[in-house]
């Protein structure tokens, strides 16, 4: 059994993922984040609602497999990540790109 995330809510979300697919999903009011791999959906929902002051209507999570990495003769694995696609209620939005 995996360990449960017990840290602060601010530590759940690591960073927003800005990819072509994630940028297209912004039109449907869906935001993609890299989150702590131990965080469950209720943890992610609470963190997003508290940090960004929005209403979350749904969350989809993905645990992609860890990829191997080799540097010279040393082999290892990349850090484990978890992706979360968060759907917001109508009228809510998160400003990922600050106006300059």
Curated annotation (Swiss-Prot):
Identify the keywords attached in UniProt to this record, alphabetized: Ribonucleoprotein, Ribosomal protein, RNA-binding, rRNA-binding
What is the stated purpose of this protein? One of the early assembly proteins it binds 23S rRNA. One of the proteins that surrounds the polypeptide exit tunnel on the outside of the ribosome. Forms the main docking site for trigger factor binding to the ribosome.
A Gene Ontology biological process term:
translation
Ribosomal protein in keyword set: yes
The similarity annotation says:
Belongs to the universal ribosomal protein uL23 family.
What is the name of this protein? Answer: Large ribosomal subunit protein uL23
Q: How does it assemble?
A: Part of the 50S ribosomal subunit. Contacts protein L29, and trigger factor when it is bound to the ribosome.
Q: Which NCBIfam families match?
A: PRK05738.1-3 (NF004359), PRK05738.2-4 (NF004363), PRK05738.3-1 (NF004365), PRK05738.3-2 (NF004366), PRK05738.3-4 (NF004368)
Question: Which PROSITE patterns would you find in this protein's record?
Answer: RIBOSOMAL_L23
Gene Ontology cellular-component terms for this entry are: ribonucleoprotein complex; ribosome
| GO molecular function (one) | structural constituent of ribosome
């Amino acid at each position: 059994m995996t360990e449960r995330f017990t840290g602060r809510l601010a530590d759940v979300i690591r960073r927003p993922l800005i990819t072509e697919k994630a940028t297209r999903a912004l039109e449907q009011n869906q935001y993609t984040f890299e989150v702590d791999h131990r965080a469950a959906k209720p943890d992610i929902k609470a963190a997003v609602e508290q940090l960004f002051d929005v209403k979350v209507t749904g969350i989809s999570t993905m645990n992609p497999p860890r990829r191997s990495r080799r540097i010279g003769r040393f082999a290892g694995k990349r850090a484990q990540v978890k992706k979360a696609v968060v759907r917001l209620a109508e009228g809510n939005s998160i400003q990922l790109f600050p106006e300059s």
